[in-house]
């Protein structure tokens, strides 16, 4: 259990039907969750509009729907989400992710970035309408404080207060282990 000072969100990862997503969302509202993310298949934008219209808790999406950043404009126009989702790997790069952030800002909507990485950290730092940085994945088989083998250190270490800072190294700030890359090239 956690206290009231801990913010809770849920990523339901497409598991629910419309009626089950509604029941889940209403339960989460009673528990004080901040949002419900992608509870249904994202191919049905009308289902998301229906859900957003019927819940008080913000509905977040789309995360993995096709259409890169252009499709997210349709979601905003339709009112299919209360908080827009983007990410460098989801929409085709840093520039499309920033375009998505600015699109949401033009609609007066928060836009949250999906996943960590140095690229996503820079997108979050460059915008005003993103409140959270999704660092790590709480999973029984993954350790989010372990970096990639090709890096000498984490791209996004968390400080003792729970904050992540943009690194001051050149470029995206990644500390690349070029010896590892050289020793693991396919020849």
Where are the regions that the model predicts?
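Metal-dependent enolase-superfamily TIM-barrel catalytic cores that perform enediolate-based chemistry
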Residues: 1-49, 54
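Short, flexible active-site loop motifs that bind/organize anionic cofactors or intermediates
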Residues: 11, 87, 110, 167, ...
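Shared catalytic-loop signature of beta/alpha-barrel
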Residues: 26, 32, 43-163
